[in-house]
Amino acid sequence: MRFIKTISVVLITLVIVFVIGCKKEKNNVTGVVVEHHEYVDLGLPSGTLWAKCNIGADNPEDFGDYFAWGETKTKDVYDWKQYKYSVFEEDSYKLNKYCTDPSCGVGGFVDNLTVLESGDDVARAEWGENWRMPTSEEFNELYQNTTFVWTEINGVYGRLLTGSNGNSIFMPATGFRLDDQLICTGLGVYWSSSLQTDCQVAAWSLHFDDVNCHVCGTYERSRGQVVRAVSNNRP
């Protein structure tokens, strides 16, 4: 009888260890949920956690929704006339927010804001206060501390980013929206929250194709691009 009790205790212990081990392995593969959305820990130096999917997407390979920089709603047309922070003055569109250069602002307007405020951050607006858009510095960290492999998932091309800990995220080549068209779907173009201060009409983006990958500051704020959210909050 004592032997049977001992065997039972051992078996129960093994079952507990096995179940705990499975749960841990599952988290490594699928990510961890924060406010109903999954993040993946890529082992980055800053500890920044990257979302598994784009804003508006259900799966990693889905493109998701497109937003002008600093806007939190989708729309049918992406141009300067429809852009939230532009006003037509004399013969060109001028900025009325996120401007450090008087020559670019309406009537010489400047506010010296160079990073999106929380109310203009679509990741926070859509997913809650524990999520936000990445900065240009965080895109650089991502690029420098992961392998970027061009691949295909379920017929969608993009980059598989793998961190030093073996965890990965997939970022599809989404293209961008200009006027009422989706164009350049062989490119991945993802907004950061950082203004391009040398060119006020643009903001920094992660840009990649099947050959190159870099952080680019030439994409105009009025065009529609996708967003991959980040978090610094571990459950």
What are these regions (language model features)?
Residues 1-11:
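Bacterial N-terminal signal peptides that target proteins for export
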Residues 18-21:
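C-terminal motif of bacterial Sec signal peptides marking the signal peptidase cleavage site
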Residues 23-25:
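Bacterial signal peptide processing site
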Residues 28-235:
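Conserved positions within compact, well-structured domain cores
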